[in-house]
Regions:
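Short, positively charged and aromatic/hydrophobic N-terminal segments
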Residues: 10, 16, 20-23, 28-31
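Sec-dependent signal peptide recognition
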Residues: 33-40
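C-terminal motif of bacterial Sec signal peptides marking the signal peptidase cleavage site
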Residues: 47-48
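The feature marks the mature, well-folded catalytic cores of soluble enzymes
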Residues: 54-446
Length: 446
């Protein structure tokens, strides 16, 4: 609404300086004469948009059912191995084969591209970035640790570290970014006089590109991850956006927590999960900054805090403006069950920018039905095979994990849903699927 106000203010201001603008009290314009006002109107629109580009962009994601046109992904590589050898510590469910996972991911990208979607990968962006930008990034990544005084040995000095970075090839710089190495140095009486332990904190969860940021109608917001294992991923995604020429509108800081799997845009509404990975402080930071760009913010409050349903998109998802899915344990829960989900509904205040609490503790199912959604239930069997974590690429057109039940296949068919079944048997062992592996940057509004 405030963009419309800005438009009319700009319109009147420009009119004052337009010499051929007729007085308002005697305006009588025929069709031919009105043509001369077209440039004036266009100027006002451009002026209004310039002050808030993202709010005027027709490509910014507004609804999950809008046609996806550009997606950011990351095909996992050698950084995944350390996570696979101790899955639980890496936030994974089971061990899985690293090479097979990469093949699955590339196949998924090919399926998306076959639908006319531009897929950009983190590796491609790093390969195209200026090499000095990579060196600057790596200077904050590669660490030398030692109790040795720098004056006692060249190998522990910061100048030696920087000299080494200055000689690195592009591929080795990218390895540093993905593996996050630390060299722990000690002295020895033999050979070069120094030895080391080589430690790594690889970005093994990076292939879940849904989580490090969210793409709202206003623009990109950099998240603040709930887990220490994933904290460095947001820096890399912010760097990728910079290389793409995208300036994020906000970064969540301090005690605020936000992960992208908790955000689902739905036209004039935003659904945002509040629970295991995203907290109310993170959500409030977005609302205070007017970062959502939706008139209504629906905070979905989860009290179960279960790893299998860590994000909103693991138990709720949207296929079209009037069709969604919900796992059966949430659909049939009572207020005595840990699976019971309620929502707080925030709406725009009178200033058109801030939000106010309009409704509190409304049962999620009742709210969804009240705004016109039909709900397809996801059985426990299908849920455990990540059936709910599909990606909607167009109205009633989804990319979903293959090998689901016949019952679910029939339910999709009965609701006119086109499903492309994606084989992801290795990748889903990392606790995520088709939705988690994609950050939809642009959608075409339908």
């Amino acid at each position: 609404m405030h963009d419309l106000v800005r438009f009319f203010i700009n319109f009147l201001v420009v009119c004052i300086f337009c010499s051929n603008f007729a007085p308002l009290n005697s305006m009588k314009i025929d069709m031919m004469k009105s043509v001369r006002f077209i440039p004036l109107v266009l100027l006002c629109v451009l002026t209004a948009c310039h002050s808030n580009t993202s709010s005027c962009s027709s490509a910014s994601p507004v609804a999950e059912w809008n046609r996806a046109t550009q997606i950011l992904m990351h095909t996992p590589g050698e950084e995944l191995f350390n996570g696979a050898i101790n899955p639980l510590a890496a936030l994974f469910e089971y061990y899985f084969d690293v090479d097979s996972a990469a093949i699955e991911h590339k196949n998924y990208i090919a399926m998306l591209e076959a639908n006319g979607i531009e897929v950009m990968t983190v590796s491609e962006i790093l390969q195209q970035a200026p090499i000095e930008a990579l060196r600057d990034y790596v200077s904050n990544v590669l660490q030398y640790e030692s109790d040795i005084d720098e004056s006692d040995h060249l190998a522990v000095s910061d100048s030696y570290r920087r000299e080494t970075i200055a000689q690195m090839s592009r591929n080795d710089l990218i390895r540093c970014i993905l593996l996050q190495p630390t060299v722990r140095l000690t002295t020895t009486d033999i050979n070069t006089g120094v030895e080391a332990q080589y430690l790594q904190s690889p970005l093994f969860n990076l292939y879940f590109t849904r989580d490090q940021s969210i793409s709202t109608p206003k623009g990109q917001i950099i998240c603040n991850m709930n887990s220490a294992q994933r904290s460095k991923e947001t820096d890399l995604i912010a760097f990728c956006y910079e290389q793409m020429g995208v300036k994020p509108i906000l970064r969540i800081t301090g005690d605020g927590r936000l992960e992208g799997g908790d955000y689902i845009p739905a036209g004039t509404r935003a659904f945002i999960g509040c629970g295991m990975r995203t907290n109310i402080e993170g959500i409030e930071q977005i609302m205070r900054a007017d970062g959502f760009g939706h008139d209504t913010v629906v905070v979905v409050k989860d009290r179960k805090w279960w790893q299998m349903q860590m994000h909103l998109d693991t138990y709720f998802n949207i296929i079209d403006r009037d069709l969604c899915t919900l796992v059966e344990s949430r659909l049939h829960a009572t207020d005595q069950d840990p699976e019971w989900v309620t929502v707080d509904v925030y709406t725009r205040a009178e200033d058109g920018i801030s939000y106010r609490l309009d409704q509190a503790d409304i049962p999620l199912v009742a709210y969804l039905q009240g705004i016109g959604f039909s709900i397809i239930p996801i059985s426990e069997e299908d849920e455990l095979h990540y059936a709910n974590n599909y990606l909607t690429i167009a109205p009633r057109h989804i990319m979903a994990v293959a090998n689901q039940s016949h019952t679910l296949v029939q339910a999709f068919e009965q609701h006119g849903v086109k499903v492309e079944w994606v084989p992801l048997e290795n990748l889903i062992k990392g606790y995520g699927a088709a939705h988690c592996m994609t950050q939809v940057i642009r959608r075409k509004r339908m």
